[in-house]
Design a protein with these regions (language model features):
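Conserved phosphate- and dinucleotide-binding cores of soluble alpha/beta proteins
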Residues: 2-5, 12, 19-25, 30, ...
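HTH-adjacent hinge/linker in prokaryotic transcriptional regulators
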Residues: 2-5, 9-24, 28-29, 34-100, ...
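Hydrophobic/small residue at the entry helix of a nucleotide-binding pocket
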Residues: 103
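Short, hydrophobic beta-strand segments that form beta-sheet elements in well-ordered domains
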Residues: 118-122, 229-232
């Protein structure tokens, strides 16, 4: 097992259990305790974990970005349910944007029964996922590949996005705040989301409930720019009223 693979597994365990113990990880992955300590040192330097006596705890700061492959394995059931709801909003022949979020990957999977779609995306993962779908037009935005995110970002990406106007923009976000709106942890992601939001007829935000009442670094858009929110469970009455204020339709599994 490569060190990176092991660290990602440790990170997944931290996400699930909030705390890990060096001796237990050493036995689980059949490596020395010193190797595990180096792994935890690396995770701490990346801001993903906080070392403690005999182990480490998860850094729950919402501004920290987990590796793509770790995020992809979080809340899988919730993402699948949201993806099905979002996919049901897409019609055969639609032109759509999909962003580079892990949630959008699940939406891409759920869309495969549709016909004659044109999908424009800045996600390498989605490009690979849809590469074998027949009868579709798959368009890459191009741009600079962001290490660890499988995403194209930057001015060339944003310029490419603005050269299209689509039926539906399907995207997610890092955080959703009643005052600040749609937020991302990095300006590059915020800029790309802003470009997408401004380039579609209907904007569909697919975001799980854990992102509600959170803030992040970059403002990507406001609630008035969203037409439909798809989430994984029924929102609180406060959030329902907030959506109603901006005439945003909210969909969730029942």
């Amino acid at each position: 097992m490569l060190a990176l693979e092991r660290r990602n597994l440790i990170l997944e365990k931290l996400q699930a259990e909030k705390r890990v113990v060096v001796s237990e990880l050493s036995q689980l992955y059949d490596v020395s305790e010193e190797t595990i300590r180096r792994d935890l040192d690396k995770l701490e330097k990346e801001g993903l974990a906080i070392k403690s006596y005999g182990g480490a705890v998860i850094n729950e700061d919402v501004s920290i970005d987990l590796p793509f492959n770790v995020r992809k394995n979080q809340n899988v059931t919730g993402k699948q349910k949201m993806a099905e709801l979002a996919a049901a909003l897409v019609k055969d022949g639609d032109h759509i944007f999909l962003d580079a979020s892990t949630t959008a990957v699940f939406v891409a999977k759920a869309l495969k029964e549709k016909e004659r779609l044109t999908v424009i995306t800045n996600s390498m993962e989605i490009l690979l996922e849809l590469a074998d779908v027949s009868g579709w037009n798959i368009i890459s935005t191009g741009g600079v590949m962001k290490e660890g995110y499988l995403a194209f970002l930057g001015s060339k990406t944003d310029e490419s996005i603005r050269s299209y106007y689509v039926d539906k923009v399907i995207f997610s976000c890092k955080a959703l705040d009643p005052e600040w709106g749609i937020m991302e942890s990095q300006e590059a992601f915020g800029s790309t989301k802003r470009a997408m939001i401004g380039s579609g007829r209907k904007r569909i935000l697919v975001v799980d409930s854990s992102k509600f009442d959170q803030t992040a670094f970059s403002v990507a858009g406001s609630m008035k720019e969203v037409d439909i929110i798809v989430t994984d469970k029924e929102p609180t009455e406060r959030w329902k009223k907030h959506f109603e204020k901006f005439n945003v339709k909210c969909l969730y599994p029942v």
